[in-house]
Swiss-Prot record:
It comes from Candida albicans (Yeast). The active site is at 669. Residues 509-532 are annotated as: Disordered. This is Protein ARG5,6, mitochondrial. It holds the Pfam family Semialdhyde_dh.
Amino acid sequence: MIRQVNKKAISNSLFKRLSLSGSAFANITANKKSSTHQLNQKTQLANVRFYSTKSTVIQLLNNIGSKREVEQYLKYFTSVSQQQFAVIKVGGAIITQQLNELASCLAFLYHVGLYPIVLHGTGPQINELLENEGVEPEYIDGIRITNPKTMEVVRKCFLEQNLRLVTALEKIGVHARPITAGVFEAEYLDKDKYQLVGKITSVNKSPVEAAINSGYLPILTSLAETSSGQLLNVNADVAAGELAREFEPLKIVYLNEKGGIINGNTGEKVSAINLDEEYEDLLKESWVKYGTKLKIKEIHDLLQHLPRSSSVAIIDVNDLQKELFTDSGAGTLIRRGYRLINRNSLRDFGNPDLLRNALLRDPEIKTGKVSVASYLKFLDSVQFKSYGDEPLEVLAIVVEQNDKIPKLDEFLSSKTGWLNNVTDNIFNAIKKDYSQLCWVVNENDANLPWYFSKSDGSFAKNGQILFWYGLNIDEASKLIKEFDSSSIGSSLSSSKESGVFTSAQQKRGFHHSTVRRNTNPNPPLSEGKQTERKKVALIGARGYTGQNLIKLIDNHPYLDISYVSSRELEGQKLQGYNKDNIVYSNLQIEDIKRLEENNEVDVWVMALPNGVCKPFVDTIDLVQNPNSKIVDLSADYRFDTTGEWTYGLPELNDRKTIAQAKKISNPGCYATAAQVAIAPLKEYISGTPSIFGVSGYSGAGTKPSPKNDVNLLSNNLIPYSLTDHVHEKEISSQLGLQVAFTPHVAQWFQGITHTINIPIKKGSLTSREIRNIYQDRYQGEKLITISGEAPLVKDISGKHGVVVGGFAVNSNEDRVVIVATIDNLLKGAATQCLQNINLSQEFGEYDGIPTESLIRG
């Protein structure tokens, strides 16, 4: 039940990402004229690189323990520009006491291609030098008073500590760049009060970006200058905050020797601070003073200017990798958070739509097996207490039933709720109110380990796991008996039997808590059952799509072209096919009939213009050969209502149905990308999606027309078929949802981009939730990439697949804009045809599709 990570597979993948190859060693021996000294130098460098990278992989695998954490690492590795990964503020004591550990952690990040912006302080060193000279450090509100003598010491300390850290990094093969000036411009904070202390007015990003772009880790001090060049001292926490405001990194980390904020009353480390709920009371605590108070104030002000999902972690240097790459984190996490709200009746929910949207996370409700209305009716008839944050990213409902043990009836969380640990806050609040609790979870729940950690005991039956805490042996035994004798089987989908959603007069049975991640309901059939060679006949394959399909078949391990037919090219050698010497023929109806009768063709591919292939299909039908299959690339049979044709979009249509079909209609290029981009949101759509599609001129075919006239297209964009385009009908028909589609042709050769406006139920989804929906729906799909950024059409040209990204929600929260790109000749035609052929012949679905040409987000 607990997921295991294939660390060998991750290791292989990571070595590829780090470009581990023998090139370093090959280069050593390539130049025979190199001196022995130079050869030894290169060998040493290569060995350092190999061992440091191997060590990096081992460190990563030791710190990552679950699939979700692997995904989190890959997300950070690919989703942001390098300078936006993290801002790390290093306390001065770390450099003095834990320099080697700090250098090792930063080297780890460097070797996996992540470039944090490092800014260090030097407080303890300054105090030590000042005390040696008999100068007593002075502070006001946690700010060091900096007179000229103190500034002399401050500057000296900063330069020394900066050099120490840079030198330590260089010794272990990390390129580091000292940046001790030129980043922060400041004015006097209060010259009379603090003297040479600055208030930062602007941040110059150029030195930082230049360092990262050159492959160096930037190592900054918090010294600032006025416009006239006067050095000013700035608190390192404040400077780190200004950097974070400017770069908006994924992670903001403060490293200190205590590994977090220590509660001065209890001596314990504070694990989390939710500022919206705790800030004012926290500042009143007697132990919150000096640097601690300044740090909390600065972080509070910083987070007001960043997305609510942002947070600051204050940790020990040894926990840096754990904080960056795991869900568990370490140290003290400070975030804005939300105030937690308790409710005891439906009337207490000020926004009913927010409640309904939260309940839609329950799979029974989401799939329509149970309605929101029926569950609300149940809640109205029982005594319950709900727990949630303000936006209901997490909603927990505890049902109280007479003398029975209270039951956690719902625990519904968005992915945001899990990643921000709101779930822990909610559960802790429940434990304060209920000394005893029970709940049931499906054994396939992705968060099962979390539930085990919250319970005192568990009992499993028929795919469901009963959890509890706070029960003695007799109470636990009684609860297990009740659970064991209940009518719940391996599933709770039959609500009538379980009594889960029946009327108020009936007893409500156990109901599983729902937080598991949705997975792909139609996974790829990557592993084939057959390896016997099959023969393909191409009818009319003289255009761009035909050329690409021929190239794919030429590289396919089990497919051979036996016939290729074209009236215009009859008698010419088939170009681009190297397995055999094939010559174009001009097959007539009688030839088709003869070949079909003699079992000479396993797959017929109709690559003909719309409205042309019917006589060929009818002839194949007349023979009634059960062994052959037909794949039609035209639009002729995409609207079939007879049941004879199957629509071949494997990512959205049942793959087993496609595999068993005699006749497969290959989807259109525009239609494929649009359906992939819209389908996962169908249940949230509140109006007509509008699709602005632009294709390269190869989509207009090889026959000359204004739509493939390169002179007319130069510096131009030509709209056509403004309404009722055949792909508009195709998209609407397949989605069961009317869409508006306007195609355009542009001056590039191949590739399509869609910008799609989708009306959604107001406030139902955030951008992140939408992206998560797409990632879950297309999990495991090799030909679909989900990207946080809007994809570019130039990146998809020549690549196999669809890229979907953008996911921008408007300020009114009732419209999302999604961008999708596809190569119209490949996944929009030839590659998709090959997928359908593979499925029909029981090959692996991706056989013959070159993996090096798959696009990745």
